[in-house]
Amino acid sequence: MNKLKLGLIIFTATVIAACSGVSNESQADTGQKSESTAELKTLPLEVFKSPTCGCCGKWISHVKDSGFETKIRNRQSLNAIKAKFDIPSNLQSCHTSVSKDGYFFEGHIPAKYIRKFLDNPPADAAGLAVPGMPAGSPGMEYGDRFQPYKIFLKKKDGSIEVFAEVNTLEEQFNDA
């Protein structure tokens, strides 16, 4: 079996395993916020995900704990929402979020980078993406395992550039 097929099988198995569990967190938006984020400006996100995806529920808990309000849209297929925002297959992940201003946030992007983007959107930006499901990213925690990853900026003209590089587990959450 060639390396590409083996890699595809391993990636598919990881996605299925990560998304097949039901999240322990309630996915209903209760409107409650932790004390540490109560004073932050609350930002709404509409989250499109599979109804059975456990890692999506964990990511939703992460953004809610960081001061975002979420509206969950469970879908059997996410192809239509990804097509609507013209998210190329090489940037796709297991869930797509949309801000009230129409920017998309694809995959396991740490909340601090979404907030940074929304506080000062780059010119001609369409959205941000973390392709795949990097181990250790918010919602994809596996003990101490961490896989460095890039957050990509997609512009309205279709061009893609690196918005941020996340090289350690800690820098996903720290503002330094």
Enumerate the language-model features and the residues they cover.
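Structural microenvironment flanking redox-active thiols in thiol-disulfide oxidoreductases
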Residues: R75-I87, M133-P138
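Bacterial signal peptide processing site
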Residues: S20-S23
